[in-house]
Amino acid sequence: KNQKGVKKPKIVFLNTSGGGLRSALWTVHVLNHLDSITKNNFFNLTHLITGASGGMIGAGFYREHFLEKIDSGNIFSTNELKERISSDLLNPLAFSIATTDMFFRFKKFDDGNYQYTKDRGWFFEKILVKNLGLFNQKRLKDYVLPEYNSKIPIMLFAPSTVNDGRRILISSQPISFLCYNDSILLNDNPSFENIEYGALFNENN
């Protein structure tokens, strides 16, 4: 609806595969190539990005670079994009696991009014943000308006819960409609296959 002057604009849905840094690098390479052959118009046609693991990291990085280019004009060269996304994550992370988990398990960090343990997830995020040179201090809510106004494609993450294997649908947009199951098909005992992150933590900040 935000594509002005185009009667029926094309719409693109991306699904990326997992596979660690190789998948992240491949995703960035493919998106960069698609942009080049469409005269940097590919993301303007893309509505939704979803997928798994490394592919989503690569797609998220490319999307963030696209947004940064729109907002501030700052851009990385093609080679720098690929170098940043393929920078080593495992060695620093393995070192942090070996040292932090054994010796510094009780180190904390503050986030607003809350305090959390510095675990491997914290280290992973710090290393990734440093490698990519983007995302610093970004939160899910920061993408509500850019996605809503079609500046960037919507990203939908769908990790599984440990307890029962259901998918948690994570997006900056309200997507509860994806969690609905028809009770007629379930003997009037609905069992929701998906859980929306935003609805689950609606009362939390």
Model-derived features with residue positions:
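Catalytic domains of lipid- and phosphate-ester/thioester hydrolases
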Residues: 1-205
